[in-house]
Amino acid sequence: MFAILLISQMKTFTLKSELKSYLNGIRKDKIVSFIPTMGSLHEGHLSLLQKAKESSDVIVCSIFVNPTQFNNPSDLEKYPRTTEIDINILTEKKCTILYLPEVSDLYQENEQVKQFDFDGLDNFMEGEGRKGHFNGVATIVEKLFRIISPEKAFFGEKDLQQLQIIKYISKQLQIPIEIIGIPTKREESGLAMSSRNKLLSETGIQKATLIYQTLKYIKENSDNFTVDQLKKIAIEKFSHQTDVNLEYLEIVSLEKLQPISEFKDANENAACIAASISSVRLIDNIIF
């Protein structure tokens, strides 16, 4: 039976040295879980927190908008930041520890992003269109893992490619952390919860529902069409929408994230979409 460590108030740290020292003092015989975020928290993040509570004594959340994973400076600048609101949410939800660092606490001046071999997991989709993105993600995740040394780390399946890459590098780097993926939290319309949704207009939110509708169509019709036929039908759905720009639509193997020509067994396939709604870039996927 797990009981979240009782503290009078959530502890907040801005320096990794102080965070490590505090964790070293409380972690004996305790399960420490970690949830990395870039802030602008929503119910999707909170579902990770809720799941972590079921098997943890200490929960560490981080809020850090990692500059090295943005290959578009304007995207970094526009990324929504709601730090005070986020702190209040985490306090209310009884997060144990918040790590809220500045860039200088995690990166040295002029530090080069580490280059990883992802064994082809980054060849398509996000890796193809956002060069260097996953090296930036893996760099910061490795840093955070080594600072916090959790037993478990929780990630949303909405960022499926990121999740699979983090699982892979954790094994390659021999970091003994259980990586746990949590199903995507959705609005009633099916739209995947995302911090970027805050940048959408009401009309944009309505148009964005096409993404999940298309993914669901692919899943429900995988017994009726070939992969190529389904891709063609699905892509056609986007051609009739104004202000909706389909960046990619791929049907891939869940394990390797490589495009497939024939469907695999149940729960070994994934359909993945990236699309911009009036310049707001959204991603989503469905596993089937």
Model-derived features with residue positions:
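Nucleotidyltransferase catalytic core that binds NTPs
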Residues: F2-D243, K256, S279, I286
